[in-house]
Amino acid sequence: MLAVSCFRVTLSLRKEQAMPEYKAPGVYIEEIGAFAPPIVGVATAVAVFVGHTEIASQAGHAVTLVPTRIDSPKDYSAIFGGAHAARFKVQPVIASEADFTAGGAGYALSSETTFNLYDSIRLFYANGGGTCYVVSAGSYADDPAQRAAALQAGLAAVHDLTGPTMLVIPEATLLELNDYRLLRQAMLTQCADKQDRVAILDVIGTDRSFPSADLRTVETYLHDRIADFRDGLAAAPETLKFGMAYAPFLKTSLVDVGDFSFANFDSDSKETVTALLASEIDRLYPARDPNAQSLKNDLRDVWDAKPPTRTVLGQKLVAQIPLLSGIFAAMAAKRGTLPPSPAIAGIYTQNDNSRGVWKAPANIGLSAVTAPTLPINDAMQDDLNVPLDGLVVNTIRSFMNRGTLVWGARTLDGNSSEWRYVSVRRTLIYVEQSVALALEPIVFEPNVAQTWARVTAMIENFLQGLWRQGGLMGPTPKDAFYVKCGLGVTMTAQDLLDGRLIVEIGLAPVRPAEFIVLRIGQHMQGA
């Protein structure tokens, strides 16, 4: 027997539609529809992003905390501006934690204030994203201490918005762990309350790379970050089927080295950077080489020069000192390391448009991505995909000759056979919302057998179309779904008195072939 998911739709019919009133004698013609009106499927891939922006102005009006529709990165830039100009501090660290090396020593780049919504939108569109909504939670100049509250306010602003099917807040990963957990739970709670959207979550802390570390170090680090993520999730089990988590972060090719200059160094790092570059000049050029002194003079002047002169001096130094180019490349890599949720939202959109919402959004290559930050293997993924507590984290992995792939298709409710898969959860939302929207004109119709038959025919036609497209399991429509509506079937006499029309729908959604097992044996030919 096929696994069937079932839900009920209840309409309140409290007034009967008035019959036409005829006064003059004569013949009147009333045309009656021979067929039930078709149900048009709702959009399945409309993301809503919340985060901080450079500006928030549309047609001269401020749109902070206002959900604003965009259709391209160009639309985003026109309304919300560009990227945040991060200022990096350069500090010596051990080699395993270094972003770059100089003179045999390791150095790390850190920035007290960072924002990632601008680059996240670019990653979303690079992976097939389409129409979406953006909510500016504030500007880059806002008090960093209020960031968590601002993101919560941005999330609240989309609660009553009709249309979005995916919640994405990449900047959640920039919060303190406790603030992150509160925002994550607020996202899941909103999804469970509205039942028309899902939350795509990132695992905080998986942005770190270990270039020279062994797999055991990576495994230990990943295990700790996953434990941090799962802590507290089980407190609201009814929300888990509306959430999907992905890890690790992604190294992208969106940010160019040319986007960085001396303006991106923190003022506290001036002496450190000057000393490093001066030593590099001494290493590259003989002591009496006139080039050496010229470069040192430029290095001295570039810090206080005005923008046009600073740009010229900076370009000259980059061309002559490979170390400086390497530092700017490290800055680009730092800013270009992004949480996976925007790319996943783009993949959902691309997958829905090309295959259908019922196809698992997995085993799909990511664009503008060079690699995941952590090299996850099969052994590491075992506990992520089938954990004892059911709190699944889908992975993004690199495969030889195949690139970086989304390698997981489960919700956080991994122990539920009914809501385990992303595609099943989203297919049910698609059916529920499409049917609910189509039945709105039925409200106030007479609650009689003719109306029940009309409603049943509408829904059956819709589900038969879904079955023909491959969205439902079963060799025949009867095996794939059923629709029930009637007195003594889904309604009692009291339901009729209370004005309720209740429809019961059962369907068998397709589930992904997650584990493909090949059984191969040798056949010995008889003598």
Give residue spans per PLM region:
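Structured, hydrophobic secondary-structure cores that serve as assembly/anchoring elements
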Residues: 6-7, 13-131, 153, 159-173, ...
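Short linear interaction motifs
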Residues: 28-30, 135-154
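Extracytoplasmic, non-cytosolic globular domains
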Residues: 184-188
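Generic recognition of short, well-ordered alpha-helical segments
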Residues: 146, 178-182
